[in-house]
């Protein structure tokens, strides 16, 4: 991931977008777990 030094100024926005994407996936996963536990109960 950190192969390229600070060459492209687009590396930071891409990393921010990737981080937000992973946060969104984590949020969906947690919500899915909560819903599944509610449905199981």
Swiss-Prot record:
GO cellular component, one term: plasma membrane-derived thylakoid membrane
Transmembrane segments: 20-40
GO BP annotation list: photosynthesis
UniProt-listed InterPro entries: PSII_PsbL, PSII_PsbL_sf
Subcellular location(s) of the protein: Cellular thylakoid membrane
Membrane topology classification: Single-pass membrane protein
Main subcellular location: membrane
NCBIfam families: PRK00753.1 (NF001972)
Function statement: One of the components of the core complex of photosystem II (PSII). PSII is a light-driven water:plastoquinone oxidoreductase that uses light energy to abstract electrons from H(2)O, generating O(2) and a proton gradient subsequently used for ATP formation. It consists of a core antenna complex that captures photons, and an electron transfer chain that converts photonic excitation into a charge separation. This subunit is found at the monomer-monomer interface and is required for correct PSII assembly and/or dimerization.
Protein name, per record: Photosystem II reaction center protein L
Organism: Synechococcus sp. (strain JA-3-3Ab)
Lineage: Bacteria, Bacillati, Cyanobacteriota, Cyanophyceae, Synechococcales
């Amino acid at each position: 991931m950190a192969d390229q030094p600070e060459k492209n100024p687009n590396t930071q926005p891409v990393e921010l977008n990737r981080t937000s994407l992973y946060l969104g996936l984590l949020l969906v996963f947690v919500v899915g777990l909560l819903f599944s536990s509610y449905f199981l109960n």
